[in-house]
Regions:
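Extreme N-terminal cap/leader segments of soluble proteins
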Residues: 1-71, 90, 99, 114, ...
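Active-site-proximal helix/loop capping residues that flank conserved catalytic or ligand/cofactor
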Residues: 11-14, 81, 163
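Residues at secondary-structure transition points
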Residues: 38, 70-74, 78, 110, ...
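Short amphipathic alpha-helices and their capping/turn segments at secondary-structure boundaries
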Residues: 42-45, 84-85, 162
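Glycine-rich anion-binding loops of enzyme active sites
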Residues: 59, 93-181
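Alpha-helical scaffold segments that flank or form the walls of functional sites
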Residues: 73-90
Length: 181
């Protein structure tokens, strides 16, 4: 068995980038993402008038939140909100999402229902559809949302586009996520 190595955040980013290089997508027909790894969302070409935005975020108990401290309703809202902020940062409009979760067997059913209610409430508030998902038993609670959005070609806001003098806007309390709130 190999030696266990702890990955840093940059190590995880590098791992994802290497996976991207290994799997470039459909062959032929010139399909390529407009913008891939390294921004808030991928920008994908579309047959329609708008480009498709795709983002995903995974939240894990003990890393991104503490289930013992976090009401289920707020956790469900957070799971979608972290993805909504990625689409907004790219200048896009959210359209639809899929949601996956893993709950420990000891989880109270009311807590799981509250998570689902929080996610559904946030989806309604932003006019987007929940179109599917998956669930499983897990050792520790995790939630994952993949969100599709839309943006006009050439209008996506990229991280590389920031310039001196641009406005920077913050919602919520700085450091709250790191504090598990």
């Amino acid at each position: 068995m190999g030696r266990l190595v702890r990955l840093t955040e940059q190590g995880f980013i590098d791992l994802v980038a290497s996976l991207s290089r290994a799997a470039r997508g459909p062959r032929g027909a010139g399909w390529r993402p407009v913008l891939g790894i390294g921004d808030d969302a991928a920008v994908l070409p579309s047959a329609g008038r708008l480009h498709t935005l795709l983002t995903t975020d995974l939240l894990t108990d003990g890393v991104h939140f503490r289930a013992a401290w976090t009401p289920g309703f707020l956790l469900g809202k957070k799971a979608l909100s972290v993805n909504l902020s990625d689409i907004a940062a790219m200048g896009g409009v959210p359209r639809a999402c899929v949601f996956s979760d893993g709950f420990p067997r000891r989880t109270r059913p009311a807590y799981a229902r509250d998570v689902a209610r929080g996610l559904a409430d946030q989806a309604r508030r932003h006019g987007l559809a929940i179109v599917g998902g998956d669930t499983c038993a897990a050792r520790s609670l995790f939630l994952n949302v993949a969100l599709l959005g839309a943006v006009e070609p050439g209008r996506e806001v990229r991280r590389s586009g920031a310039r001196a003098g641009d406005g920077l806007y913050v919602t919520g309390a700085l450091g709250a996520a790191a504090a598990g709130l």
